Structures are given as C-alpha cells and as structure tokens.
Amino acid sequence: MKHPIHVTSEIGELQTVLLKRPGKELENLTPDYLQQLLFDDIPYLPIVQKEHDYFAQTLRNRGVEVLYLETLAAEALTDKKLREEFVNRILKEGQADANVAHQTLKEYLLSFSNEELIQKIMGGVRKNEIDTSQKTHLYELMEDHYPFYLDPMPNLYFTRDPAATIGEGVTINKMREPARRRESLFIEYIMKYHPRFANHNVPVWLNRDYKFPIEGGDELILNEETVAIGVSARTSAKAIERLAKNLFSRQNKIKKVLAIEIPKCRAFMHLDTVFTMVDYDKFTIHPAIQGPKGNMNIYILEKGLDEETLKITHRTSLMEVLKEVLGLQELVLIPCGGGDVIASAREQWNDGSNTLAIAPGVVVTYDRNYVSNALLREHGIEVIEVLSSELSRGRGGPRCMSMPIVRKDI
C-alpha cells in the first residue's frame, strides 16, 4: 500500500477524508455547561445527523473516500492491554478520577465492546449511569450537582482541529481548551495502532505532549513548500515556532511557514474561519481581519543557521506575501458576505469563509451563506452547498468538519 497520508495543498483533489458523525455527546449539552463545553447553542441531534450524513454523501458523490474517527478508533483498540491503557489515559486527562473512584469508572467503560466504548467516551458518562451499590468511597456517595463523571466531547465533529496532515506526516495537537484536550488522543492511537497507519511510520511533526497549543483550524497547506498558520485565540506563536523548526529539520520540502496574526476572539477562532484557499489564485477572506489599508501582521519563518534558529521576516500585506510564495502575478481575495458590513459579519459567524476545497476551483459550503456563495460563483468557483441549519450551531463549517488524509498533488 502507498503511504496512507499525502497532503501538499489546500486545493488538490480530495481523495480520502476523516469525519466524525455527531452523536450522543450533543444530547449531553445543557444550558448550564455550554460555555465550559465551548458551544453557544444545543443542536437538534436527529437533524444534525441528517445534515452531516448529507455532507458525507456529498463528498462520496465526488469520489472521496470517507473515514470515520469513531470507527478507526474502535478498530485500533484490538488489544486488551491497549484498551485499558487508552481508558486510563482518557480518565486521567478528563480528570474523571477527581469525581469518582477511577477503578469504578474504568470497569464500567471496559465492560463495553470497542465500538460502544468509543461512543461512550465521546458521549460522556452521566452520574446516573453508575449503580450506587457499586460505589465504595464516601466522596462517591456525596451529593454533587455536576451531572457527569466523564464530560461529553461535543466538538469532536470538527475533526480538523485535533490534528493536521502536512505532507506525509501529521501534527497531533495540544488543544488550548480543557474541553477539547482529549480529542487528539484518538488520533494518537489511530496513528500508532490502526493497521491503515501503524506500519508506515507516519512522521509526527509536533506531538500533543508539547506544552504550547496549536489547532488544525489554524494550519493551512498553501503548497508543497509553504504552510500558513494562524496566530489565534487557539494557537500559540511558540507552538508555530517549534513546528517550523521541526518541519525544516525533518521535512525537507517545506521552505517557509507563514505565521498570520488574527484577532483573538471567538468569532475568529481559527485562521480557517476567516481565510481559506478555493483555487490556485483565489481565497475567501473576512475583511475584518485586515486593517483599513489591508494591512495585518504576517511573519515569514525560514530555516536559520542551524536546527534551532529561524530567520523571521515581518510583512504587512497578505496579498503580496501570498503572490510571492505561490509564484503568482495576480491573486483574488474574495470577501465573505461581499464586504457588506452586515452580511459579512453574519455569514462569517455562520462560517461563510470556512470553505472546503475538494479540487481546484470546487468547494463545499453551507447553503445559508448565500451572499458569499453567489460571490464565489461570480469568480468562477463551483460551489456545492450542503445543509446547515443545525450543523452551524457548533460554529464550524465544512473545512472545520473534515480532516484531509489524501489529496492529489496540484
């Protein structure tokens, strides 16, 4: 089998993608804990699943192989000791052992089949699921109004963030927010133990044990030699610097890393919520990330004199930097919402800039962003719209919901 991971651009024909079908974790959202679990609203599960299935089928209709995170994770945990190790790490990282006797919860989880185990970990464990007669410690029996022994993981359907593919390797990411930290553990075990990946020594450019956060929504592969990474509310400049050094020393094709600073707020959570590539010479952009004259902070990172030094160049014109690294004379930045102050803010909030390119000039978008979609079509882009009334409540679009595994080179 050829190498299982190959991604050298944002727009090469998508061949294999990783998704996560929304599940029980969304039904474990309650108003009291929305902020803690990073949601603004509670999606209606039957409809959000129908919309996600429609999204997956749309990709299949264009020849894309669709893999599911929950399936790969279950298939990776075939060994009994491995299952136990995985559960121990999930409980430790979820701080579940602070709420209930570790052994009680561990035994409960290990009583399930692999598929059920993964769904239960993702969905969360409510306190009323554990039989009181099985509780052997005083603190387990004390009244506590927090409803979970193990928190649900409702953000998992945004598979873009826990990891990112660069070339034939991955970053397995330390997530900034505690509610999402366990997510990348699934990717770690899949890469190490799933037969599709385990025998290929997949390079890990940056691992989840690195102390500074980085998330896949901030990682964009512009071409074989250039990666753009957002310095954002979720991704640290220190993590970008470490990743750049690792890429330059271990991945000899990457020559430049662009660190693009964006406003650190929830509406502009990741770079891909305000900026995505849709064709060889076209990008969507939310105008609010730039200053009045189109200026913003961009830092070009290149290899220094040795493995631990970098050459860093500060620039302020995104347009000029993109033309330079892509070798283009002309380039188009298509404004989300057509640049209208109301439409752009509304459609960006509903991920109008978060397009998923499945081939050069072919993108998947949410149907609700009709102003942005019309503008993309005016620029010659084929726009494939997917249903979005419930999916969009999670504040992520088609790019957020997908992790490319294989793309054709452009």
UniProtKB/Swiss-Prot annotation:
Record keyword Cytoplasm present: yes
Reactions catalysed according to its record: L-arginine + H2O = L-citrulline + NH4(+)
GO CC annotation: cytoplasm
Active-site residues, as the UniProt record annotates them: 400
Chief location category: cytoplasm
Gene Ontology annotations of biological process type: arginine catabolic process to ornithine; arginine deiminase pathway
Enzyme class: hydrolase
Protein name: Arginine deiminase
Annotated organism of origin: Bacillus cytotoxicus (strain DSM 22905 / CIP 110041 / 391-98 / NVH 391-98)
